[in-house]
Amino acid sequence: MKSWVLGAAGIAGAGVALAVNSRDAGAAASQAWPAFVLVAGLLLVGLVAAEDGLFAAAGAALRRACPNSLVLFCGMAALIMVVSAVLNLDTAVAFLTPVAVSAGGRSTDAGLEEGLEEGRPNVGAALLPACILLSNAGSLLLPGSNLTNLIVVTHARISGGSFASRMFLPWIAVGLVTAGVVAVLSRDSLRAKRDGSPTQLGGESASAEESPGRPRLGVGAVGIGAAVAAMLLLGSPSLVVLAVGVAAVCARMFGARMLGVRAPGGSVKVARVAQVLNLPVLVGLMGLATAVGTLGRLWSGPSELLGHLDPLGTAVAAAVSTVLINNLPAASLLSARAVTHPLALLIGLDVGPNLFVSGSLAWVLWLSSARACGVDPGLRRALRIGVVAAPLGTLAGVAALMLTA
């Protein structure tokens, strides 16, 4: 019900913007739509990859290979960063949160859920906040890693490869700082012994654990490769990535003979596709982005403020704005006019949401994914860590960005 309310609000907002100034509303819509089309394609690719067991198998392999909780945490942190960069932070949060719960397993004292509720040391207490915080931090590398990236750089026509070359060092710096803060503030959990038993979950993750380390290398893997290639090579990859996602889902639904790849494990259900895409939310957010983008074109205040700030000040202003109005409206508002330091703006927009739940919808997705596994993810604990990690990560990211200039 709430998703339909958001959808209606977004459509109404876009309608008001169109009535007030059709030219600016059209410009705002043209800036916003590629981001939402691309994320829809990436969510579809991520869904097929999850159905193929790729994420669950990666988590199971890490659990088997890592000798202790700290090494497991480092491996999961790297996995979260890479999936966020390649398949978008929303995909990472949706499909890796169950993997983090499963990989956390049971401590020698209690099961994961009991350990989290009773405050007992458990590696899951570090993996769960890491999932949301590192998903945000890991969304700096490619234009498609975060909706805000595409909104800000849409008119720049910069290729994914060029964007990645400029943002690689900031991505590494923010990721290392964020992971380090989570590890330090969760050090008791990372000292806990593991018993080698994964937490059993319902649905796809549980089934993947039945044959850990043996993912179905078919349509999902092909889709990931094609989506990554499009984002790296094309200046405007949105429609191509959407086509890849639709083709991947159709291949799983109707068979993959036409593509020359195998699609074992059954077809993707239409209801599951609708659940993952959540079109009312995507349409609503695009409408709101259009409305706020129109406001940014009519009101010169945000542009004038950013014009007087250095890169660090720009990043800080962006981070604060994500807490106040959410990162997507903030991206539309602050980039409606030319920005002096667009990449610094992105660091604030991507890392700032770690400060508070209002920063991005990924927080809501993280909470719902963890609770669907029957686990309370510990929101207050994650926020306490995020309040420390976000400022330090922003500072590290801007410093690394200035080194690449």
Report the location of each language-model feature.
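Alpha-helical transmembrane segments
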Residues: 31-43, 163-180, 342-357
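Long, contiguous bundles of hydrophobic transmembrane helices that form the permeation core
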Residues: 176-264
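Juxtamembrane and boundary regions of transmembrane helices in multi-pass small-molecule transporters
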Residues: 161-211, 222, 362-405
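Hydrophobic alpha-helical transmembrane segments
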Residues: 8, 36-37, 70-78, 92, ...
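Membrane-interfacial helix-loop connectors
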Residues: 80, 84-90, 94-134, 147-166, ...
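Interfacial loop-to-helix junctions that mark the boundaries of transmembrane helices
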Residues: 1-3, 24-35, 160-170, 210-214, ...
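Hydrophobic core segments of alpha-helical transmembrane domains in multi-pass membrane transport
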Residues: 8-20, 40-46, 80-81, 135-138, ...
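Transmembrane helical segments that form the transport core of multi-pass membrane transport proteins
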Residues: 30, 47, 51-52, 56-59, ...
